[in-house]
């Protein structure tokens, strides 16, 4: 029997796409007014679940109920989409229209030929006052910040009568203060009966917001944890069980080396008077509430921005050329498994891409290839003859980090290391970074989401409006 308060029920779901089982025996029940956290240990089945929620993708087995109505099963599938809203990095608002048009007209609330914008303004102000925001009704959608856009989508979902809202990795692109304001709005609408599924790979974030947390692995829910006393410890124990890792000792207790990178009053098109000192073997995280500083650091490290003022010193020696051309500096891009590998090159050519030019000799290159195979096969396995396209994500990350190790830099810039990655991949990335730190290579992590704070970081510098706020 289903509870009368049930908003969504997924019973023993099995969903297969392109011959691969995406959801298998998936069981989940969400109640009206509940904030359900969803943490995926790996990414398998998450996108398929979102598609199932919205568009009733045909299933091989099981039943889906929405507002106590059967909407999908292996026998029957409703052709119309469910009134379920997904809020993520991709905008679902219509550019060229105002906030009021999106919230009241496109949501289907107003069906009259003549629309009274004054009434829109009053109703929007009531909603905004309840959740603590102030967005003008006549403001164009393309002028909204990321936080304002998320809030408008949430207000639109409420006005359209949606009973369930899915928020997908919100903390990856919203600043820390904005996350707190969004959580306040979520709690407000939950108190009025709206249900939420909050997808995040940070258990700290989920524990601070959700009533329950569902842990998903390989397309199945393996645990649903009530957020009562002891809940957080149970989640930690489960993570250790699946990852086979224990908590790392605090990096702050480890000895520091000498300063290997020093930015002294550095100015570029996006950076203004930035001072920064990074020690040999140190992991330093730089957190900013907007992407301007992050973009400026990336453009500086990759040589896309010229130095307009100040000095960049490595091991006390100033560099007079772009950092990207200096062998002592390496850069790992956001989503490197897609951005930093050459699909048409062999594994070994990708691996040795950053080595000096003296391996251009065919005989020299073949000797290096044999040596690398012999040294790395026990650690990496039989990956050297694989096509790059056939590598899994963890193998691609291992390839990228071994390439960096072969380059032997003094400092590595790593942008958004956890962006969009599942829990198991995050653990793998941490192990790869530890390889760099063990070689006394400094790692500078650039992050936007406050819950992406890197566990290995000895220090975290928090910037606001381009200025250092705290350390």
Where are these regions (language model features)?
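Single conserved hydrophobic/aromatic residue that forms the stacking wall/gate
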Residues: 1-10
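Conserved beta-strand
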Residues: 11-15, 21-31, 62, 261-282, ...
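The feature captures the beta-strand-to-loop junction immediately N-terminal to the Walker
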Residues: 39-42, 287-291
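Conserved ABC transporter NBD signature motif
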Residues: 61-71, 80-82, 309-327
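Q-loop/switch helix immediately C-terminal to the Walker
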Residues: 90, 95-109, 335, 343-361
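H-loop/switch region of ABC-family ATPase nucleotide-binding domains
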Residues: 200-201, 446-448
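A short, surface-exposed alpha-helical micro-motif characterized by mixed small hydrophobic
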Residues: 206-208, 453-455
């Amino acid at each position: 029997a289903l509870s009368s308060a049930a908003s969504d029920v997924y019973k023993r779901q099995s969903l297969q796409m392109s011959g691969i089982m995406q959801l298998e025996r998936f069981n989940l029940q969400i109640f009206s007014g509940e904030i359900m956290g969803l943490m995926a240990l790996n990414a398998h089945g998450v996108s398929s679940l979102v598609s199932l929620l919205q568009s009733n993708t045909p299933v091989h087995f099981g039943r889906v109920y929405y507002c106590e109505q059967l909407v999908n099963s292996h026998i029957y599938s409703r052709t119309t989409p469910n009134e379920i809203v997904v809020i993520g990095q991709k905008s679902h608002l219509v550019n060229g229209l105002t906030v009021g048009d999106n919230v009241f007209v496109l949501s289907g609330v107003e069906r009259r030929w003549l629309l009274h914008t004054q009434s829109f303004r009053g109703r929007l102000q009531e909603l905004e006052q309840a959740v603590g925001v102030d967005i003008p009704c006549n403001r164009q959608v393309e002028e909204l910040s990321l936080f304002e856009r998320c809030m408008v989508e949430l207000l639109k979902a409420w006005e359209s009568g949606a009973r369930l809202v899915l928020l997908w990795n919100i903390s990856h692109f919203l600043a820390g203060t904005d996350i707190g304001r969004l959580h306040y709005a979520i709690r407000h609408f939950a108190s009025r009966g709206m249900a939420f599924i909050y997808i995040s790979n940070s258990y700290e974030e989920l524990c601070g917001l959700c009533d329950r947390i569902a842990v998903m692995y390989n397309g199945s829910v393996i645990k649903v944890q009530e957020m009562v006393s002891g809940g957080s410890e149970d989640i930690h124990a489960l993570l250790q069980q699946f990852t086979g890792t224990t908590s790392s000792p605090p990096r702050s207790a480890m000895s520091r080396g000498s300063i290997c990178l020093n930015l002294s009053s550095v100015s570029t098109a996006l950076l203004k008077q930035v001072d920064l000192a990074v020690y040999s073997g140190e992991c330093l995280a730089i957190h900013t509430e907007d992407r301007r500083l992050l973009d400026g650091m990336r453009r500086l490290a990759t040589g896309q921005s010229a130095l307009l003022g100040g000095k960049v010193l490595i091991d006390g020696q100033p560099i007079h050329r772009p950092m990207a051309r200096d062998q002592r500096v390496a850069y790992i891009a956001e989503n490197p498994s897609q951005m930093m590998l050459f699909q048409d090159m062999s594994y070994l050519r990708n691996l040795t891409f950053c080595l000096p030019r003296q391996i251009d000799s065919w005989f020299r290159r073949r000797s290096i290839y044999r040596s690398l195979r012999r040294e790395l096969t026990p650690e990496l396995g039989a990956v050297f003859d694989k096509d790059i396209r056939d590598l899994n994500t963890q193998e691609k990350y291992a390839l990228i980090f071994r390439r960096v190790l072969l380059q032997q830099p003094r400092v590595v810039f790593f942008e958004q290391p956890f962006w969009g990655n599942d829990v198991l991949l995050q653990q793998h990335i941490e192990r790869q970074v530890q390889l760099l730190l063990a070689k006394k290579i400094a790692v500078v992590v650039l992050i936007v989401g406050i819950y992406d704070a890197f566990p290995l970081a000895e220090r975290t510098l928090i910037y606001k409006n381009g200025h250092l706020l705290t350390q």
